[in-house]
């Protein structure tokens, strides 16, 4: 399935129906009064966040969306039928942005959130509404109001428990494929992953959602490589799993390349809890691995893990699961001052 995380849409709510100017016409009723009905309200366009969706693919060929207009009122005080609302489902984590002002209208970051982006026009008034003691037979009615219209941008920022980060070709896709049911493409060349992939890893009796973020290169914060197309997805991850190719000549430089790009893009990203793993350890001798591991651990002043292609992933997944659960517990503390 294609992954689409940004689309531009033109939205037009339905116009209100016109009011009606009519009079009662019956046998033996010489002076029937006004009985024109009101116009129906135009349809709204409403967005709802759906936890079962993970891409904006539904909008690929649907860039102009218009709700139906209300029907005009008729005689016998019958109001016109209201226009039908349009309900649009988007993935959780979708931001709705005004294209002109670039203002975030709403951030649908929780399941089942509902937001009306454009409102349908009010229906016009029939001539019954203008009857008075001085005007017993009004012929005046009003037209329906036009529905709101707006150009918007939908931007999806993937919601996941763990985000796998690192330079291109460090084994991120392979890790996700091994620990989940993801069908991520794997290859021995840079930018095998050109869009975020999501996978669900089972850890004992629970599950965690893991996102494979495309490789980060120097100047990614300026848009180099795949740039902003994927850096934004890291903002919603609870934990970062930083994979580094152990065969890299300069381990610290390899770490800093990714770390610095995150900091330059959004300084808050480097405040996220990070687990650092040296990957592809089956390609080097144990003594060389230990030397690089200790060198990086001393530089970071924290533990660095090692991973080979044949290693059991459950220990790392359990560690990630524990960290994720801690984040969930600490999301909101109403008693914390």
Swiss-Prot record:
All copies of domain Obg, residue ranges: 1-159
Binding site for GTP: 166-173, 191-195, 212-215, 279-282, 310-312
Keywords: Cytoplasm, GTP-binding, Hydrolase, Magnesium, Metal-binding, Nucleotide-binding
OBG-type G domain sequence ranges: 160-329
Entry-linked SUPFAM superfamilies: Obg GTP-binding protein N-terminal domain, P-loop containing nucleoside triphosphate hydrolases
Source species, domain of life: Bacteria
UniProt KW Cell membrane keyword: no
Sequence positions that bind Mg(2+): 173, 193
GO molecular function: GTP binding; GTPase activity; magnesium ion binding
Cofactor(s) recorded in Swiss-Prot or TrEMBL: Mg(2+)
Gene Ontology CC: one annotated term: cytoplasm
Signal peptide from the UniProt entry: none
A Gene Ontology biological process term: ribosome biogenesis
Disulfide bond annotation, renumbered to this chain: none
Subcellular location(s) per record: Cytoplasm
Transmembrane region(s): none
EC number(s) recorded for this UniProt protein: 3.6.5.-
Family: Belongs to the TRAFAC class OBG-HflX-like GTPase superfamily. OBG GTPase family.
Xref: PANTHER family: DEVELOPMENTALLY REGULATED GTP-BINDING PROTEIN-RELATED, MITOCHONDRIAL RIBOSOME-ASSOCIATED GTPASE 2
Entry function: An essential GTPase which binds GTP, GDP and possibly (p)ppGpp with moderate affinity, with high nucleotide exchange rates and a fairly low GTP hydrolysis rate. Plays a role in control of the cell cycle, stress response, ribosome biogenesis and in those bacteria that undergo differentiation, in morphogenesis control.
Subunit annotation: Monomer.
Protein name: GTPase Obg
């Amino acid at each position: 399935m294609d992954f689409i995380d940004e689309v531009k849409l033109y939205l037009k709510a339905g116009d209100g129906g016109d009011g009606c100017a009519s009079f009662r016409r019956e046998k033996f009723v010489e002076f029937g009064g006004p009985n024109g009905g009101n116009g129906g309200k135009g349809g709204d366009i409403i967005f709802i966040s759906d936890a079962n969706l993970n891409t904006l693919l539904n909008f690929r060929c649907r860039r102009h969306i218009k709700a139906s207009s209300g029907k005009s009122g008729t005689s016998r005080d019958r109001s016109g039928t209201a226009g039908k609302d349009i309900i649009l489902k988007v993935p959780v984590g979708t931001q709705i942005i005004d294209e002109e002002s670039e203002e975030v209208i709403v951030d649908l970051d929780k399941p089942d959130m509902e937001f009306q982006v454009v409102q349908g026009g009010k229906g016009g008034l029939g001539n019954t509404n203008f009857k008075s003691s001085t005007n017993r037979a009004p012929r005046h009615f009003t037209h329906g109001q036009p529905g709101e219209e707006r150009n918007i941008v939908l931007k999806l920022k993937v919601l996941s428990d763990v985000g796998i980060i690192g330079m291109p070709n460090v084994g991120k896709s392979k890790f996700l494929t091994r620990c989940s049911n993801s069908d991520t493409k794997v290859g021995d060349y840079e930018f095998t992953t050109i869009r975020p992939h999501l996978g669900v890893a089972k850890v004992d009796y629970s599950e965690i959602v893991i996102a494979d973020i495309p490789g980060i290169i120097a100047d990614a914060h300026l848009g180099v490589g795949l740039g902003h197309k994927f850096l934004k997805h890291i903002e919603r991850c609870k934990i970062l799993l930083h994979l580094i190719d152990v065969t890299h000549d300069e381990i610290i430089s390899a770490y800093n390349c990714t770390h610095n790009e995150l900091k330059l893009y959004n300084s808050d990203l480097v405040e996220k809890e990070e687990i650092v793993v040296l990957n592809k350890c089956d390609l080097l001798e144990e003594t060389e691995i230990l030397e690089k591991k200790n060198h990086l651990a001393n530089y970071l002043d924290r533990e660095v893990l090692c991973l080979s292609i044949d290693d059991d992933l459950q220990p790392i997944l359990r560690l990630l699961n524990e960290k994720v659960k801690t984040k969930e517990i600490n999301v909101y503390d109403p008693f914390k001052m």
